Protein backbone atom coordinates (compact mmCIF):
# COMPACT_ATOMS: atom_id res chain seq x y z
CA UNK A 1 0.00 0.00 0.00
CA UNK A 2 1.12 3.53 -0.72
CA UNK A 3 2.06 5.71 2.21
CA UNK A 4 -0.16 8.78 2.62
CA UNK A 5 1.96 11.82 3.33
CA UNK A 6 0.97 15.39 4.12
CA UNK A 7 3.51 17.96 3.04
CA UNK A 8 4.11 21.27 4.80
CA UNK A 9 2.41 24.40 3.46
CA UNK A 10 5.56 26.42 4.04
CA UNK A 11 9.27 26.00 4.76
CA UNK A 12 8.50 27.79 8.03
CA UNK A 13 6.47 24.76 9.17
CA UNK A 14 9.64 22.65 9.22
CA UNK A 15 12.12 22.87 12.11
CA UNK A 16 14.96 25.02 10.71
CA UNK A 17 12.96 25.19 7.48
CA UNK A 18 14.02 28.73 6.64
CA UNK A 19 17.65 27.60 6.80
CA UNK A 20 16.88 24.80 4.33
CA UNK A 21 15.13 27.23 2.00
CA UNK A 22 18.03 29.70 2.08
CA UNK A 23 20.58 26.92 1.51
CA UNK A 24 18.63 25.58 -1.47
CA UNK A 25 18.25 29.06 -2.95
CA UNK A 26 22.03 29.54 -2.72
CA UNK A 27 22.61 26.25 -4.55
CA UNK A 28 20.22 27.14 -7.36
CA UNK A 29 21.15 30.80 -7.75
CA UNK A 30 23.80 30.18 -10.46
CA UNK A 31 21.40 27.97 -12.43
CA UNK A 32 18.33 30.17 -12.83
CA UNK A 33 19.87 32.49 -15.46
CA UNK A 34 20.76 29.40 -17.54
CA UNK A 35 17.17 28.18 -17.81
CA UNK A 36 15.29 29.57 -20.77
CA UNK A 37 11.90 29.14 -22.43
CA UNK A 38 8.33 30.30 -21.87
CA UNK A 39 6.90 28.40 -18.89
CA UNK A 40 8.29 27.35 -15.49
CA UNK A 41 6.16 25.12 -13.26
CA UNK A 42 6.81 25.36 -9.52
CA UNK A 43 5.21 22.23 -8.10
CA UNK A 44 3.97 22.34 -4.52
CA UNK A 45 4.07 24.97 -1.80
CA UNK A 46 7.79 24.57 -1.01
CA UNK A 47 8.62 25.19 -4.67
CA UNK A 48 6.28 28.20 -4.73
CA UNK A 49 8.18 29.83 -1.85
CA UNK A 50 11.61 29.57 -3.47
CA UNK A 51 12.99 32.77 -4.99
CA UNK A 52 13.18 32.29 -8.76
CA UNK A 53 13.27 35.94 -9.81
CA UNK A 54 16.69 35.41 -11.44
CA UNK A 55 15.25 32.74 -13.74
CA UNK A 56 15.28 33.73 -17.42
CA UNK A 57 11.78 32.22 -17.79
CA UNK A 58 9.34 35.02 -17.04
CA UNK A 59 6.06 33.05 -16.95
CA UNK A 60 6.22 31.13 -13.68
CA UNK A 61 3.24 29.15 -12.41
CA UNK A 62 2.75 27.80 -8.88
CA UNK A 63 0.87 24.49 -9.02
CA UNK A 64 -0.61 22.49 -6.15
CA UNK A 65 -3.75 21.05 -4.60
CA UNK A 66 -4.13 23.68 -1.90
CA UNK A 67 -2.36 26.66 -0.43
CA UNK A 68 -1.87 30.38 -0.83
CA UNK A 69 -0.29 31.90 -3.91
CA UNK A 70 -1.16 29.08 -6.31
CA UNK A 71 -2.08 30.05 -9.86
CA UNK A 72 -3.21 26.54 -10.82
CA UNK A 73 -5.04 24.14 -8.50
CA UNK A 74 -4.23 20.71 -9.85
CA UNK A 75 -3.36 17.13 -9.02
CA UNK A 76 0.34 16.55 -9.63
CA UNK A 77 -0.50 13.13 -11.09
CA UNK A 78 -2.88 14.65 -13.67
CA UNK A 79 -1.48 18.01 -14.68
CA UNK A 80 -3.84 20.12 -16.82
CA UNK A 81 -1.15 20.83 -19.41
CA UNK A 82 -0.54 19.43 -22.87
CA UNK A 83 2.32 17.04 -23.50
CA UNK A 84 5.64 18.81 -24.11
CA UNK A 85 4.27 22.26 -23.25
CA UNK A 86 6.44 23.26 -20.27
CA UNK A 87 10.08 24.39 -20.47
CA UNK A 88 11.17 23.80 -16.86
CA UNK A 89 9.82 22.26 -13.69
CA UNK A 90 10.88 22.77 -10.07
CA UNK A 91 10.19 19.95 -7.59
CA UNK A 92 11.44 21.35 -4.28
CA UNK A 93 10.93 18.38 -1.96
CA UNK A 94 7.73 17.63 -3.88
CA UNK A 95 8.69 13.99 -4.42
CA UNK A 96 9.53 13.72 -0.72
CA UNK A 97 5.84 14.08 0.13
CA UNK A 98 4.40 12.23 -2.87
CA UNK A 99 2.35 9.07 -2.37
CA UNK A 100 3.80 7.73 -5.63
CA UNK A 101 6.94 9.72 -6.49
CA UNK A 102 7.85 7.75 -9.60
CA UNK A 103 4.38 8.26 -11.08
CA UNK A 104 4.62 11.99 -10.34
CA UNK A 105 7.99 12.12 -12.08
CA UNK A 106 6.51 10.43 -15.16
CA UNK A 107 3.69 12.99 -15.28
CA UNK A 108 6.18 15.85 -15.06
CA UNK A 109 8.18 14.19 -17.83
CA UNK A 110 5.03 14.10 -19.98
CA UNK A 111 4.52 17.88 -19.87
CA UNK A 112 8.20 18.83 -20.22
CA UNK A 113 9.46 19.72 -23.68
CA UNK A 114 12.43 17.90 -25.17
CA UNK A 115 15.57 19.43 -23.65
CA UNK A 116 13.40 20.86 -20.87
CA UNK A 117 14.87 21.48 -17.43
CA UNK A 118 14.05 19.56 -14.25
CA UNK A 119 15.18 20.68 -10.79
CA UNK A 120 14.68 18.28 -7.86
CA UNK A 121 15.53 18.73 -4.20
CA UNK A 122 15.02 16.33 -1.31
CA UNK A 123 16.32 15.34 2.10
CA UNK A 124 19.37 13.08 2.25
CA UNK A 125 18.86 9.84 4.25
CA UNK A 126 22.62 9.65 4.97
CA UNK A 127 22.62 12.74 7.17
CA UNK A 128 21.73 13.91 10.66
CA UNK A 129 18.15 14.30 9.44
CA UNK A 130 18.22 10.76 8.12
CA UNK A 131 19.28 9.50 11.54
CA UNK A 132 16.16 11.14 12.95
CA UNK A 133 14.01 8.66 11.01
CA UNK A 134 15.45 5.92 13.23
CA UNK A 135 14.18 7.57 16.42
CA UNK A 136 10.64 6.37 17.23
CA UNK A 137 9.62 9.69 18.78
CA UNK A 138 10.72 11.67 15.72
CA UNK A 139 9.77 9.58 12.71
CA UNK A 140 6.15 10.81 12.68
CA UNK A 141 7.15 14.47 12.87
CA UNK A 142 8.33 16.90 10.21
CA UNK A 143 10.61 16.60 8.36
CA UNK A 144 11.40 13.02 9.37
CA UNK A 145 8.01 11.81 8.14
CA UNK A 146 9.01 12.67 4.56
CA UNK A 147 10.51 10.24 2.10
CA UNK A 148 14.28 10.57 1.93
CA UNK A 149 15.78 9.36 -1.33
CA UNK A 150 19.40 8.52 -1.93
CA UNK A 151 20.85 10.47 -4.83
CA UNK A 152 21.54 7.13 -6.51
CA UNK A 153 17.84 6.29 -6.51
CA UNK A 154 16.88 9.65 -7.99
CA UNK A 155 19.62 9.32 -10.60
CA UNK A 156 18.31 5.86 -11.53
CA UNK A 157 14.81 7.26 -12.08
CA UNK A 158 16.16 10.09 -14.20
CA UNK A 159 18.30 7.68 -16.21
CA UNK A 160 15.25 5.54 -17.01
CA UNK A 161 13.48 8.64 -18.31
CA UNK A 162 16.60 9.62 -20.29
CA UNK A 163 17.60 12.78 -18.44
CA UNK A 164 21.11 14.18 -18.47
CA UNK A 165 22.21 15.28 -15.01
CA UNK A 166 24.10 18.57 -15.21
CA UNK A 167 24.53 19.21 -11.51
CA UNK A 168 24.12 17.25 -8.29
CA UNK A 169 25.08 18.21 -4.77
CA UNK A 170 24.51 17.44 -1.13
CA UNK A 171 24.82 20.33 1.27
CA UNK A 172 23.84 21.84 4.65
CA UNK A 173 25.36 19.29 7.05
CA UNK A 174 24.13 20.83 10.34
CA UNK A 175 20.35 21.37 10.08
CA UNK A 176 20.18 23.78 13.04
CA UNK A 177 22.94 26.05 11.69
CA UNK A 178 21.98 28.88 9.30
CA UNK A 179 24.97 28.17 7.05
CA UNK A 180 24.78 24.41 7.63
CA UNK A 181 28.23 24.30 9.24
CA UNK A 182 30.62 25.76 6.66
CA UNK A 183 33.64 23.61 7.57
CA UNK A 184 31.64 20.38 7.47
CA UNK A 185 29.87 21.41 4.27
CA UNK A 186 33.26 21.95 2.64
CA UNK A 187 34.90 18.74 3.82
CA UNK A 188 31.96 16.34 4.29
CA UNK A 189 29.32 17.43 1.77
CA UNK A 190 28.09 13.84 1.37
CA UNK A 191 26.55 14.16 4.86
CA UNK A 192 24.51 17.20 3.87
CA UNK A 193 20.86 17.12 4.95
CA UNK A 194 19.78 18.46 1.58
CA UNK A 195 20.36 17.23 -1.95
CA UNK A 196 19.66 18.86 -5.30
CA UNK A 197 19.76 17.71 -8.91
CA UNK A 198 19.55 19.81 -12.07
CA UNK A 199 18.83 17.75 -15.20
CA UNK A 200 17.66 18.09 -18.80
CA UNK A 201 15.28 15.88 -20.74
CA UNK A 202 17.14 14.53 -23.74
CA UNK A 203 15.53 13.82 -27.10
CA UNK A 204 17.49 10.73 -28.11
CA UNK A 205 15.05 8.40 -26.37
CA UNK A 206 16.31 4.89 -25.85
CA UNK A 207 14.07 2.20 -27.31
CA UNK A 208 12.80 -0.16 -24.61
What is each of the regions a protein language model found here?
Residues 117-145:
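Conserved class I S-adenosyl-L-methionine
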Residues 102-117:
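A short glycine-rich, Lys/Arg-flanked "PGG" loop and its adjoining helix->strand segment in the class I
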Residues 1-33:
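Class I SAM-dependent methyltransferase Rossmann-like catalytic core
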Residues 89-90:
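Hydrophobic beta-strand segment of the Class I
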Residues 135, 145-168:
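Short alpha-helix
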Residues 164-192:
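Conserved catalytic loop of SAM-dependent methyltransferase domains
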Residues 208:
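Conserved small/polar residues in nucleotide/adenosyl-binding loops
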Residues 26, 30-79:
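Class I SAM-dependent methyltransferase SAM/SAH-binding core
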Amino acid sequence: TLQKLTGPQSWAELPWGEYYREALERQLQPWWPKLFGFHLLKMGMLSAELATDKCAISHQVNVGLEGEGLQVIADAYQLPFAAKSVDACLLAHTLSYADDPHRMLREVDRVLIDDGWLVISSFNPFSLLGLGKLVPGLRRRQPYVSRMFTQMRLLDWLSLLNYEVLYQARFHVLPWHRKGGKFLCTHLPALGCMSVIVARKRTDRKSV
